[in-house]
Amino acid sequence: MTNQIRERLQKFAHSLIDQEKAQVIIEPQSNAKGFWFGGGNIILHNGMFWLCGRYRNEGDSRTGVGAGERGLELAIFSSSSINGPWEKVKSFSKSDLEHDNEEVVSIEGASFLINDSGVELYISTEKKRSYPEDVIGFQKKGTGVWDIDLIVAPKVDQLNAESIERAIRTEDLGSLHLKDPVAFNLSEEREGVGLFFCSHPFTWASSNTGLAIRRQGEEKFRIKSFNAIERGRSWDVACTRITDRLRIPTVGLLEDQRPMSLYFYDGAECLRSLEENPDASKRPRGFSCEEIGGMGIGYDDQFPDILRFSEDFPMFISPQGTGCSRYISTIVTNDGILATWQQSRKDFSQPLVSNFLSMESITEIFAS
């Protein structure tokens, strides 16, 4: 990859995730610390745009679910236009998402995917179940274990929690908690489904990205890797969580290049907020629930190999609040690309914001 193409890719990413131009599209339930909406994506299906995400209220999984409500509701919005306005049309509570006699104590990220027969909705929840016996002493009172479920329907408005089933779960101690699914088709011909997911070890010491694959004709996912992209060595040493895979338009300088995808990810120096030395370089460092953003690039014919672009420093930081900028997701249309993400505000809430980059602007960025 030439330096020129690398620079244009970075310019493209910054133009898409423009922190100053971002507009709020979904507000959290309160404009206060610990409240946000997001962690989902947008699809276009049957002539309508559909947006999924979860409302999160104050609480801390590191100290137990008794610390607050936390992941409260999975909501689905619709709009006839990619620019909104968005109307809430469907909602799932914790009790709605319970199955196999396991109580849901918190709702985390979700992901829509269009398939040949309709729509899939992947949902991550924390269920009230115990750690494996040999590490039970590490489990805090009131906490559970995360895994990922799936609901399938011909249309979005027909999604029903009564058909919910498990998608992936593991007893691997280093990746015991699985959440924040990112579903995508492995090819334009839909030869199978890829599922990135975030994992935490039983110690909650780090956040990692795993990859599961379900080939065409298969009914179940197989976990291919718990380390689809390695954690970084500086600003993202504690957390590297992929939140989106974006196939980059092949225009201008990219017309003669092999097809590429951009991978947005969340990163952090530590899962807890670090006490900064008074003489240190003051900066947002990222921590659990307040991550900041980076990106990587991968050639599609070499999937899942990913080249990290944000090696030494983060690329996406909110100019407000804690600097948190996370859960980036994108949707490509004929007119351009819409990006959404959670952005920290002055009141430390995290509404879902968006920015649209026109295809005309994208063509200008990659012009020869």
Language-model segments: what does each one mean?
Residues 1-39, 43-105, 113-180, 184-321, ...:
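Beta-rich carbohydrate-recognition and catalytic domains
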